[in-house]
A protein has these predicted regions:
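N-proximal low-complexity "stem/linker" segments adjacent to membrane-targeting elements
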Residues: 1-23
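A conserved acidic beta->alpha catalytic loop
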Residues: 38-46, 90
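Glycine-rich, basic loop-to-helix element that forms the pyrophosphate-binding segment
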Residues: 62-78
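Short beta-strand/loop segment that forms part of the nucleotide-sugar
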Residues: 31-40, 60
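Short, flexible, basic/aromatic active-site loop/helix in glycosyltransferases
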Residues: 114-121, 128-154
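Short, acidic, metal-binding catalytic loop of nucleotide-sugar glycosyltransferases
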Residues: 22-31
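Conserved donor NDP-sugar-binding/catalytic core segment of glycosyltransferases
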Residues: 95-127
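Short aromatic/hydrophobic "clamp" motif used to bind/position activated sugar donors
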Residues: 83
């Protein structure tokens, strides 16, 4: 049986959640469970989630809004040995579970994520996607070189991050006080337990933020936020440059 619990934090994701849940229903092998943790959606997100509710797909309501809090709540309810954190607007390959289990079969690996290809209805954001791929490597090399050579790679939300449940709990999970770059913060904690690996497989994430900002502005904001984060600027300050676009 699969060991993977997939956790999806949601907030007003009615436009994409149904597609994502349909994709998860055809995974081979299937996930042990899918936990949808909603932060108070005001659209049809919760209704859509309940339509898919089953013995392996559960809907959880979070009293507190915020990805870190919602993902921690999902992790607390999860029964799998492995946790996979998935954004509602991200498409995954059918063998997602197998790739995750194979990656963590290496005991020297504490966590991992995928290569994110940013796509929209009419275009693929090759330039932005390439930068995000490279950022996984150059950000830790520049700002945490001692950890880079220990195996640190900085993963971000749309890369479908995964790790062992025990390592997640022992690392303290996501910091609820961090409103942005919470996955990167978790990488800093997980690398104390093993390498972080970006697997050579692609997931597709919505380009909705880039579509609103434009490629140049989006890349500039990503660079600015990443640079300030590397210098230790608080996530609370950085969040104001990364407004909600839904």
């Amino acid at each position: 049986m699969s060991r993977v619990s997939i956790i999806i934090p949601t907030l007003n994701e009615a436009k994409c959640l149904e597609r994502t849940l349909r994709q998860l229903s055809v995974l081979e092998p299937t996930a042990k469970e899918v936990l949808i943790v909603d932060g108070g959606s005001e659209d049809e997100t919760v209704a859509i989630a309940h339509r898919f509710s089953s013995s392996t797909i559960r809907v959880i309501s979070s009293d507190t809004r915020g990805r870190s809090v919602q993902m921690n709540q999902g992790a607390a309810a999860a029964t799998g040995d492995i946790l996979c954190f998935l954004h509602a607007d991200t498409s995954v390959p059918d063998d997602l579970v197998a790739v995750i289990e194979q990656t963590l079969a290496d005991k020297t690996v504490a966590g991992g994520g995928f290569i994110s290809l940013m796509t929209g209805e009419q275009t693929t954001r090759w330039g932005v996607s390439l930068h995000n791929y490279l950022k996984t490597y150059y950000a830790p090399l520049i700002f945490r070189p001692h950890l880079f050579f220990k195996g640190l790679r900085l993963l971000f939300g749309d890369q479908v991050m995964f790790c062992r449940h025990a390592d997640f709990l022992e690392s303290g999970g996501f910091d609820p006080a961090i409103p942005i770059l919470e996955e990167a913060d978790l990488c800093l904690k997980l690398v104390q337990r093993g390498k972080i690996r970006q697997v050579n497989r692609v997931v597709q994430s919505s380009d909705r933020r880039v579509a609103k900002w434009g490629s140049l502005k989006a890349t500039a904001i990503y660079l600015y936020i990443g640079f300030l984060w590397g210098l230790g600027v608080s996530g609370t300050y950085l969040k104001k440059f990364y407004e909600d676009i839904r």
